[in-house]
From Swiss-Prot:
One of its GO terms (biological process) is ATP synthesis coupled electron transport. This is NADH-quinone oxidoreductase subunit K 2. One of its GO terms (molecular function) is NADH:ubiquinone reductase (non-electrogenic) activity. NCBIfam families: PRK05715.1-2. Keywords: Cell membrane, Membrane, NAD, Quinone, Translocase, Transmembrane, Transmembrane helix, Transport. The gene is nuoK2. NDH-1 is composed of 14 different subunits. Subunits NuoA, H, J, K, L, M, N constitute the membrane sector of the complex. It comes from Symbiobacterium thermophilum (strain DSM 24528 / JCM 14929 / IAM 14863 / T). It is found in: Cell membrane. GO terms for cellular component: NADH dehydrogenase complex; plasma membrane. Its main location: membrane.
Length: 107
């Protein structure tokens, strides 16, 4: 018995929506970064789902989806490390983590 496609796609959309909601409503920079990572995980889940379910109609696209997912994971790791470095610099210079209070990064 095969899992219907709308289960993993729904979960991916839910993860993306939750990440988007959190990134737009939070004021803490670390939380915003975490919600952006949740959004990227939702995108990765949808990529793998489409690869799994449509490999018969387009085998070359099915082979590219895991590679694209690894690329997205690599970019997400780089984005997280740069984002955490910026947040750490913001805390050292301004003493705040809230995005609203840190309007200038000049220091």
């Amino acid at each position: 018995m095969e899992l219907p496609i709308y289960y993993p796609l729904g979960l991916g959309a839910l993860l993306f929506g939750l990440g988007l909601w959190g990134a737009l409503t939070q004021k803490n920079a670390v939380r915003i970064l975490m919600f952006i990572e949740i959004m990227l995980n939702g995108v990765n889940l949808n990529l793998i789902t489409f690869s799994r379910y449509y490999w018969q109609t387009s085998p070359e696209m099915a082979a590219r989806a895991p590679i694209l997912t690894l690329f997205v994971m690599t970019v997400a790791a780089a984005e997280a490390s740069v984002g955490l470095a910026i947040i750490l610099a913001m805390v050292r210079n301004r003493g705040v983590v809230e995005v609203d209070k840190a309007t200038l990064l000049k220091g």
